[in-house]
């Protein structure tokens, strides 16, 4: 899977929201908005000491150039496509949403995960792929979650949409 080619299908570059793109030593990449970054950083789950320090401090210090240089954060502007924005707004009953992106663990089953939020509240998550095998895994996961919910298990995530987008 080419993560950049998938991102190009649902991100509009050069316009929209101000985000920072950064990667860790394992070549995992994130796109985090400058607005409500503390909420967005919930998508960033570091295990190492340096990553945990960055998660705690970057939302407060991202405006300092020296900090961005230390972590090799690139300033980018982008927004999601209108089709995807409409879908999220409809699913979450909101007129505006915010997003952050994890580009996945580099592996054969790499997928993109988006965190959808509004203000200080996380609304949900979205997984994205262009790989048919991974899409089948998504469908199986959605079916399992639905079955667990039917069996009465509490706190089971609800899959609100599992399908293809026409924009790619």
Regions found by a protein language model. Name each.
Residues 19, 51-54, 107, 122, ...:
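Polar low-complexity intrinsically disordered regions enriched in Ser/Thr and small residues
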Residues 110-139:
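ATP-binding glycine-rich loop module of kinase domains
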Residues 2-102:
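Juxta-kinase regulatory segment immediately upstream of eukaryotic protein kinase catalytic domains
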Residues 104-110, 153:
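A short catalytic or substrate-binding loop motif that flags glycine-/basic-rich loops and adjacent residues
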Residues 98-101, 123, 133, 144:
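Sparse, context-dependent recognition of short Cys/His-centered cofactor- or disulfide-binding micro-motifs
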Residues 79-89, 128-167:
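A conserved alpha-helical element in kinase catalytic cores
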Residues 95-98, 126-127, 141:
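Generic, low-specificity signal for short hydrophobic/alpha-helical stretches with a mild N-terminal bias
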Residues 101-103, 114, 157-163:
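Conserved beta-strand elements flanking the ATP-binding pocket of the protein kinase catalytic core
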């Amino acid at each position: 899977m080419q993560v950049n080619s998938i991102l190009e299908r649902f991100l509009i570059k050069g316009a929209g929201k101000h985000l920072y793109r950064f990667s860790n030593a394992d070549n995992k990449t994130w796109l985090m908005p400058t607005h409500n970054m503390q909420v967005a950083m919930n998508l960033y789950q570091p295990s190492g000491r340096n990553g945990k320090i960055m998660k705690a401090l970057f939302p407060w210090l991202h405006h300092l150039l020296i900090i961005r240089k230390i972590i090799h954060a690139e300033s980018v502007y982008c927004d999601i496509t209108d089709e995807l924005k409409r879908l999220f707004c409809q699913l979450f009953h909101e007129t505006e949403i915010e997003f952050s992106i994890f580009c996945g663990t580099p592996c054969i089953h790499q997928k993109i995960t988006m965190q959808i939020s509004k203000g200080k509240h996380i609304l949900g998550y979205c997984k994205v792929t262009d790989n048919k095998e991974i899409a089948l895994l998504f469908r199986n996961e959605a079916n399992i979650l639905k079955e667990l919910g039917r069996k009465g298990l509490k706190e089971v995530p609800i899959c609100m949409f599992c399908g293809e987008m026409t924009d790619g």
